[in-house]
Regions:
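Flexible, small-/acidic-enriched active-site or ligand-binding loops
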Residues: 134, 187-218
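A short core secondary-structure module
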Residues: 145, 149-193
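Short Gly/Pro-enriched turn/cap motifs at secondary-structure boundaries
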Residues: 85-86, 112, 127-130, 154-157, ...
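Long, acidic (Asp/Glu-rich), low-complexity accessory segments flanking structured domains
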Residues: 213-232
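Short Ser/Thr-interspersed hydrophobic loop/turn segments at strand-loop and sheet-helix junctions
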Residues: 46, 69-74, 168, 184-189, ...
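A short, Trp-centered hydrophobic/proline-enriched beta-strand micro-motif
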Residues: 115-123, 167
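N-terminal glycine-rich flavin-associated loop
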Residues: 81-103, 129
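Alpha-helical interface subdomain recognition
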Residues: 1-79, 99-104, 111-116, 131-132, ...
């Protein structure tokens, strides 16, 4: 996609968010909740699932457009909304488009594009985070149906989603290779939402426990082939990690912009704190770290568009960008002094929203292990 086209999409997205999100965001943050109608509004604005095919009502754009929208949300400080958006548009929709049947795509994608259906992805369990082989949720065949039982935790969009892609064991003897994915309609009997999980940050991203008690799924709820769920998840992880990196770099850029504006205005000892050498050096360090990760992100985005992004590069990018996000925003907050620790100043939200980025989508520790394996073998 040409830079001019991408800039147009960015501008359109930013205008829509300034109009539909910015005036209400502080109230949503305080309430620790997001109105369900926002997703319909974003759908009407053409911002949901923009790189899905036109035949499903989407723009048929390049994936870079989805990443650009993610970046604008993150740069503006809407970290929680960006995470919910990423799950819906950057993960769930591509799963269905890439591995679903035509029947599944026609049933779900148009409604995801419009915002009528909000998507969630349910992999993590109380005893299975990074270790997919420890999943206990299971699906058993019963005639032409599957019977789903188990529970999931830390599920983004879990309180509001109408569609949940659930990872479940279908062949216990095969471990992770016996995992399948199912498209679960949240209106089905036996599907229950637990409590909303309160978090350190990202308060506008609802996070929930989900329970499945004898949920009867039709045969066509299986996404992809039976026992190929792990393969599908591994195939889609580079895109997920690219999206997280886009959030990380853009949020750091937004935090830096806030900080520069602050130090140019704030005075101490009779002069602006921007005139102090420590301030100037810290800002120079932060800008450099962001620029390095921006270059790596853009390179990986180009590789993804060409079908060349490797799992190794995606892991390095996710690790580097999220560690950078946390460290640079910490430096920015320090320059605000005590004000930076108050909710009144947005830098505190950038700080709180950043911390989870080193955990979800693969922890920094797992990313380092993956990179090491690529060099040294198992």
């Amino acid at each position: 996609m040409q830079n001019e086209e991408l800039t147009l999409f960015r501008d359109m997205a930013r205008r829509a968010m300034e109009q539909e999100i910015a005036p209400h965001f502080e109230a949503w943050e305080a309430a620790h909740a997001l109105p369900r109608e926002l997703w319909n509004t974003l759908g009407a604005a053409g911002l949901l699932c923009p790189d899905m095919p036109e035949e499903y009502g989407a723009a048929g754009a390049d994936p870079q457009v989805t990443f650009a929208i993610l970046e604008e949300m993150s740069r503006m400080g809407f970290g929680g909304i960006a995470t919910g958006y990423s799950i819906h548009s950057n993960i769930v929709a591509p799963y269905i488009n890439n591995f679903g049947t035509e029947e599944q795509k026609n049933h779900w994608l148009p409604r995801m594009v419009s915002g009528e259906v909000l998507g969630a992805l349910a992999m993590t369990e109380p005893g299975a985070g990074s270790d997919v082989q420890s999943i206990r949720t299971n699906a058993v065949r019963d005639g032409d149906e599957w019977v789903l039982n188990g529970s999931k935790i830390f599920i983004t969009n879990g309180m509001l989603a109408e569609l949940v892609i659930v990872a479940a064991i279908t062949d216990p003897g095969k471990g992770a290779k016996g995992t399948s994915l199912f498209l679960v309609d949240a209106s089905l009997p036996g599907f229950e939402r637990g409590k909303k999980i309160e978090k350190l940050g990202q308060h506008t991203s609802d996070t929930a426990e989900l329970f499945f008690q004898d949920v009867r799924l039709p045969a066509n709820a299986l996404l992809g082939e039976e026992n190929k769920g792990f393969v599908i998840m591994m195939t889609e992880l580079p895109r997920e990690r690219l999206g997280i990196a886009a959030q990380a770099v853009a949020a750091a850029e937004g935090a830096l912009e806030l900080t520069v504006n602050y130090v140019l205005e704030r005075k101490a000892f009779g002069q602006t704190i921007a005139s102090f050498q420590n301030t100037r050096f810290k800002l120079a360090e932060v800008k450099t770290e962001i620029a390095l990760n921006r270059a790596f992100l853009d390179k990986c985005a180009d590789q993804y568009a060409a079908g060349e992004l490797t799992a190794d590069d995606a892991a390095m990018l996710k690790y580097s960008s999220t560690e950078m996000q946390c460290s640079t925003i910490d430096e920015c907050l320090q320059l605000f002094g005590g004000y930076g620790y108050t909710i009144e100043y947005p830098i505190s939200r950038y700080y709180a929203d950043a911390r989870i980025q080193r955990i979800y989508g693969g922890t920094s520790e797992i990313m380092r292990e993956l990179v090491a394996r690529s060099m040294l073998g198992r």
